[in-house]
Amino acid sequence: MANKFLMALVLVLIFPVFAFAKDSPEWVANLNVAQETGQLAIVRGIKGSDAEFSFHVKDFDGKWSEIISCPAFIGKKGWGKTREGDMKTPKGVFHFTMAFGIKDFYGCKIGYTKVDDTNYWVGDSNSEYYNQFVSTSYYDDFNKKDSEHVIDYNPGYQYCLNISYNEDGVPRLGSAIFLHCYTKNKFTGGCVAIPEDKMAEVLENVRDDCIIIMDTDKNIRNY
C-alpha cells in the first residue's frame, strides 16, 4: 500500500492534475512537432491581429491535454516577420529561451529574472549583443533609443517569455519577440500577448523542452 501511494505521489509531482484540463484536439496530437516534445504552446491566427493561444502537455501514455486556452493578439500588421520594426509576428517553430518580467515570480521551472532599471533588450543592429537581454552594469555600448528598456513596458512585460526568433542575432532581422501580457492595445509590435493571469499559468508550467508553433489557422496543422 505504501509503495502504491508513493508511486501515485511521484506521478502527481511529475504530471500534475490540472483542474481545467481537457483533451487536446486530435490535430494537436498528430502534429509532427508533437512527437518531439512533451509540451506545446500554439498561437493560431484567427483574423488580422486576433489569435488564439493554447498550451498542451503530454502524459506518460502519450495522451495530450490542453491546460490553458485564451484569446491572444499578434502583430499590428499580421504574420510574416522579415525585418526589424515591420510590426509583424514571425511564423514557424520556436522555443522559449528565458523567462523574465517586472513582477516577482517564483516556481518557474526554466528560471525567472526579475528585471531592474539596468535591463534592456538590445534592438541596435550594430551591437554585438543585438537581440539579447543585457544589464548596463556590465554592457553599455549600444543605442538605447533602438532598444527596449524592459522595466518601462508596463503592463505588457509584467511577465515575459522570450521566443527564439532570430536567435543568432542577424542584424535587422528583428528582435524582442516575446510571449507577454496584454496591454491597452488589441495588437502588438510583433510579439504575442495574452491575459496576465494566463501568462502566469504558462510560467508555472513551462519546461525546457516546450516548443511553440505560430501561424495562421490555415497553416498551423502543417507543423
Language model segments and positions:
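Residues that recognize and position ribonucleotide moieties
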Residues: V192
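Bacterial Sec-dependent signal peptides at the C-terminal "C-region" and cleavage site
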Residues: A2, P16-P25
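Cell wall/extracellular polymer interaction/catalysis modules
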Residues: K22-G189, K198-Y223
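Conserved "landmark" site that anchors the functional core of diverse proteins
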Residues: P195
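Bacterial N-terminal signal peptides
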Residues: A8-P16
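Bacterial N-terminal signal peptides that target proteins for export
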Residues: M1-M7
